[in-house]
Design a protein with these regions (language model features):
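Glycine-rich phosphate-binding loops of nucleotide-dependent enzymes
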Residues: 1-205
């Protein structure tokens, strides 16, 4: 579903609204122009070019921030990297190393840095902490919380119950392509979410 929202996949029915107005993104580029960021579930196949430097991965949607009149500026490039490597504590502090040489947590932080640089108003994260260690998870949760406090709306897709309950203000449960529940913080619990997630299957049985 989230790929349909950003124009990466076509949808058969329904509509997407932004600030109360219908929008139809033909490609992810259209979504980027509206400051909508998307962090995919499979970072190694969809989020990064593993044999390319982590720096160039971060520049791919931010070329205008490190160039003037189409010409790359070394000072802007250096400042950009210093800012985000420091802010997100990306390690090792070597932006010219290939992305594959970074741990899963640091790869994910580099992807977040790339999209944070566009100053998103909406950030969609698909399974943002899958396959990373506990320490990196805590850092990513903190980054998400800070973005939210600055006014960025966060849409997180997750299959981890503790993550959902710990991070979300509102939960929308989907099962077999349809919404089965919409719960705010005062309403949701593990039991209610699990019941809603199996609702369609139970009806079919």
């Amino acid at each position: 579903m989230v790929k349909s929202i950003i124009g990466a996949m076509k949808y058969d029915s329904g509509e997407v609204k932004l600030n109360g107005k219908p929008v139809h993104f033909l490609s992810p580029h259209d979504a980027i122009q509206e400051h909508i960021a998307f962090i995919p579930e499979n970072r190694k196949e969809e989020g990064l070019f593993l044999d390319t430097s982590i720096a160039n991965n971060m520049f791919m949607v931010n070329y205008n921030r490190i160039s003037r009149k189409g010409i790359l500026r070394k000072k802007l490039k250096k400042n950009f990297l210093n800012t985000f490597f420091s802010k997100l504590d990306i390690r090792p502090n070597d932006p010219e190393k290939p992305a594959r040489d970074f741990s899963g947590g640091n790869q994910q932080k580099a992807i977040l840095a790339k999209w944070m640089a566009i100053e998103p108003t909406i950030m969609i994260l698909d399974e943002p902490t899958r396959g990373i260690d506990i320490g990196a998870k805590a850092e990513i949760y903190k980054l998400m919380d800070n973005l939210s406090k600055k006014g960025c709306s966060i849409i997180m897709v997750s299959s981890e119950m503790t993550e959902i309950i710990g991070m979300c203000d509102r939960v929308i449960v989907m099962a077999e392509g349809r919404v089965t529940a919409e719960l705010d913080r005062t309403e949701f619990s593990q039991e209610r979410i699990m019941a809603a997630s199996s609702e369609t299957t139970q009806k079919a049985g």
